[in-house]
């Protein structure tokens, strides 16, 4: 990453930051102006956690069976804010060492609505002005991350499985309180069609026209839109474009819309399947790269039928 995508004048002529996933616990840095490189060490919040090397999938001609993928942080995706800080999806602790505030019985508003358990990757931030890295312990899992254009510089994330998580970066930078600054919400379809979030049936239950329905729509891509909604992609077959409208209190008001790629009567993809990378433009059009080798666009405004209710479960648009 080299700039804030909301304002690409940020960090002009500055350094470029990368991510190494399981290879090493540092951010590789390129300074194209000085023709130099650097490394920014990253580390878990828990000093007693050093991860575990991943077994080699096959014998390497060079490394043999040596387990070289041994990073503790597994940094996947960097993103830059308006002040040039680099925010990353990075492991802060053992995935199974779940903080109490994440779990059932916590007074955290997100946990009261939908408690969470194990999560494999969290957040972190590097501030070039102070040369300081800070791991951020989140309840929700992370994979990709993207800033909304709001007063809180809300950082939305994918990779949370049954929930989508966010961090109020303004609050976190002011207080350092990761627990208070974060939140998450499950994916709830408005299947009773009344326009608000109500009690819901679980993913393995049939639709009840009097209730809403929770779905396990883990996001791969995540993209906040200009209207305050948050979009993402789902990798399953045939895959889907997912739209979450947070509402006044996302813990309890967020509603999800789920738009699958079209199937024929035999359940075969008509053209293309399984969205991966995705972004949303200023007109609310979703642009996607598909695992089938296609590119695609989705224009919600062209949907003909209702966008909520008992039939709005994927193949309705």
Predicted feature descriptions by range:
Residues 1, 37-71, 114-140, 170-217, ...:
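Surface-exposed loop and turn segments in beta-propeller and other repeat-based domains
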Residues 11, 28-35, 244-246:
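Polar/charged low-complexity regulatory segments
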Residues 34-35, 73, 121-123, 128, ...:
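Marks the mature luminal ectodomains of secretory-pathway proteins
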Residues 14, 34-35, 51, 84, ...:
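Detector for glycine-centered tight turns/loop "hinges" at secondary-structure junctions
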Residues 10, 16-22, 81, 86-95, ...:
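Conserved beta-strand positions in repeat-built beta-propeller and related beta-rich domains
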Residues 1-13, 67-83, 144-152, 209-227, ...:
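Structural signature of eukaryotic scaffold interfaces centered on beta-propeller domains
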Residues 18-28, 88-119, 161-187, 232-243, ...:
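Short, conserved, GDST-rich strand-edge loop motifs in beta-rich repeat architectures
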Residues 78, 114, 118-126, 152, ...:
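Ligand-binding pocket scaffold of soluble enzyme catalytic domains
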